[in-house]
Amino acid sequence: MRTDSWIDNPCPIARTMSVLGQRWAVLIIREALLGRSRFSEFKERLGIASDVLSTRLSELVDAGILQVVDYQEPGDRTRSRYLLTEAGHDLIPVLAAIGQWGHRHLAREHSSAYRFVEADTGESVAIGFRRRNGSKVPTDAVSLVAPGA
């Protein structure tokens, strides 16, 4: 399903889904968070068709999530790397929340070892809500409020 028409939606969730809702987009971002940056790395790790990967990378660049940086190995032609932008790095808590939900609600016997950890300690981290003063808010105490409510 194409979600291009959502880009003009007043809802920020719908606008975000116009980018992240495209098949492969979130997995490409996950791979970029793991340090992959070359077309061949994305293709190999994801098993995605070249034409689809090319389209998704272009969409993520156009959305400001990835940036293209050219590089050249000695004796080789110029190639492109795809690096996360600030907007791309801002998706870390979004992907962490998706992963946290998946571990909890879609657990499998041989589940993935992907997890988010604190860089300095290696300790697992969890996503949650906090008030402006830093105190925790239970998820069941949080409501989504529509405009004008």
Each model region followed by its residue ranges:
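Long, low-complexity, charged/polar intrinsically disordered regions in eukaryotic proteins
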Residues: 1-8
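N-terminal helix-turn-helix DNA-binding core of bacterial DNA-binding proteins
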Residues: 11-52
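Short, hydrophobic-biased segments on the C-terminal half of alpha helices
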Residues: 57-58
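C-terminal regulatory/oligomerization modules of transcriptional regulators
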Residues: 96-149
